[in-house]
UniProtKB/Swiss-Prot annotation:
Its main location: other. One of its GO terms (biological process) is purine nucleobase metabolic process. The active site is at C319, T321. GMP binds at D352, G353, G354, G375, N376, G401, M402, A403. PROSITE patterns: CBS (PS51371), IMP_DH_GMP_RED (PS00487). K(+) binds at G314, G316, C319, R322. It is found in: Glycosome. A motif (Microbody targeting signal) lies at residues 490-492. This is GMP reductase. Coiled coil: none annotated. It comes from Leishmania major. It comes from the Eukaryota. Belongs to the IMPDH/GMPR family. GuaC type 1 subfamily.
Length: 492
């Protein structure tokens, strides 16, 4: 400890507004030639380095679907029941798929009314286009197919078996290794909209639909799993019940789990990562852990088995950890320190929080982050959860921190432990606010990626990896920051 009256030599912490990237000679002739692909974790690759934050006002299934279609990924928040979070995972997986593992099924003895209810299933926008008719929901032996058009002139009491197209007249396949191109060719030559894939006993295994093939072939940027489904992540905590949550999420189809607590450099987080990596129910997916702010934390989580790191203690727009607990590290320095350790082990890093502009994304990635996690910038979009409110004559949506008062009270109420002690004991490290309604998410992502492409080009690079090797920073004064924005005009 320093002697009384003297100050120790303190390290300096920098954030995004303290620096700029120095422009360098560029061989890039077009921004379109810049490669923005990266890794989220050891085994998950993305087309763009943007991750939707696991906040209940930012990322549920709608946000996650758009994120994956645009080349990124969404992390589903955990401030809901296990069943609700798993249902969101399944919705993302069904939104765009080559092989549908659980097609909607119905029995031959069902009525028209029951069939209509199944066709209008709420798990997919607009319902489903057809139902697979099976003899039994357990054995799943295919009997036929029922479409909406089959019901057009049917009476209310008509049975499915009298309305369906029998299996003898259907195009089916037993080739469970069929490729996307092969399926498209079968549909073209046989003029069919659906191909059920059957097992040796005629049991229904998968379903391929024309609409899903068109979605896949029409979007080359989407991040997909090995079965052609959109990828999605899910957040968990470190409590006893989170072991059950983790196993259920993996079973539902989550591609990655994010152990997400405010102070990730803790025995609770480290022990959770270790447990997930040895549990056969969860160790088949990558595990990301955080949040952290130091090189020591990065090393400890990597030693525990983490496949990715989430960096950021207190930089978020709705986070007040640094004010309440006096703890944190300015974000640019955090990213640099953690990434330096992570790179040695081949573990990707997520820069979580403090991103206000596309330029900040460029700085975070140049500093060593492989991806950035966005909350505020994606809140208020059409896909973001929450109702549209009107404030001062303008449409807004709510954004709130997951360590804030409202989120924790909602959690306590859901867990049926809401009493007077909860109100007295809670020390919030997050706040609630509103953001303007911003419209669809996809155009916002395109603008951010366009800025990143420019930033990579200014660094004289063609890719993220190249940028991280070549990037050079310059510190700037407050006057330099003011000069960086628009000035000396009246904005329109």
């Amino acid at each position: 400890m320093a002697a009384l009256g003297s100050l120790p030599t303190l390290p300096e912490g920098l954030t995004y507004d303290d620096v700029l990237l120095i422009p360098q000679r560029s061989p890039v002739r077009s921004r379109k030639a810049v490669n923005t692909s990266t890794r989220l974790s050891r085994n998950i690759h993305l087309k763009i380095p943007i991750v939707a934050s696991n906040m209940d006002t930012v990322c549920e299934d709608k946000t996650a679907v758009t994120m994956a279609r645009e080349g990124g990924i969404g992390i589903l928040h955990r401030f809901c029941s296990i069943e609700e979070q798993c249902a969101m995972v399944r919705k993302v997986k069904r939104a765009q798929s080559f092989l549908i593992e659980d097609p909607r099924m119905i029995l031959p003895s069902a009525t028209k009314a029951e069939a209509l209810e199944e066709l209008n299933w709420s798990g997919r926008k607009g319902g489903v286009s057809c139902l697979m008719v099976v003899d039994d929901l357990t054995s799943r032996r295919l009997c036929g197919v029922l479409t909406k058009s089959d019901l057009t002139f049917a009476t209310g009491s008509a049975l499915v078996e009298t309305l369906m197209t029998p299996v003898s007249r259907m195009v089916v396949s037993t080739n469970t290794a069929i490729t996307l191109e092969e399926a498209r060719e079968v549909m073209r030559t046989k003029r069919t909209k659906n191909i059920p894939l059957l097992g040796p006993k005629g049991e229904l295994l998968y379903l391929i639909t024309r609409s899903d093939i068109l979605k896949l072939t029409g979007n080359l940027n989407a991040t997909l799993d090995s079965r052609g489904r959109l990828i999605v992540g899910a957040a968990i905590g470190v409590k006893k019940e989170d072991h059950e949550r983790a196993a259920a999420l993996v079973d539902a189809g989550a591609d990655v789990l994010v152990v997400d607590i405010a102070h990730g450099h803790s025995d609770l987080c480290i022990d959770m990562v270790k447990a997930l990596k040895v549990n056969p129910l969860t160790n088949k997916v990558d595990i990301i852990a955080g949040n952290i702010a130091t090189a020591e934390a990065a090393q400890d989580l990597i030693d525990a088995g983490a496949d990715g790191l989430k960096i950021g203690v207190g930089p978020g727009s709705i986070c007040i950890t640094r004010l309440v607990a006096g703890s944190g590290v300015p974000q640019l320095s955090s990213v640099m320190d953690c990434a330096r350790v992570a790179k040695k082990h081949g573990v990707p890093c997520i820069a979580d929080g403090g991103i206000k502009t596309a330029g900040d994304i460029c700085k975070a990635i140049a500093a060593g982050a492989d991806t950035v996690m966005l909350g505020n910038m994606l809140a208020g979009t059409d896909e973001a959860p929450g109702r549209v409110l009107v404030k001062d004559g303008k449409k807004v949506k709510i954004i709130r921190g997951m360590a804030g008062f409202g989120a924790n009270i909602s959690k306590a109420e859901r867990e049926q432990r809401l009493d007077e002690d909860v109100f007295h004991d809670l020390v919030p490290e997050g706040v609630e606010g509103s953001v303007p309604c911003k419209g669809p998410l996809a155009p916002i992502l395109k603008q951010l990626v366009g800025g990143l492409r420019s930033g990579i080009s200014y660094c004289g690079s063609h890719s993220i990896a190249d940028m991280q090797q070549r990037a050079r920073f310059v510190r700037m004064s407050g006057a330099g920051l003011r000069e960086s924005g628009s000035h000396d005009i009246s904005k329109l």
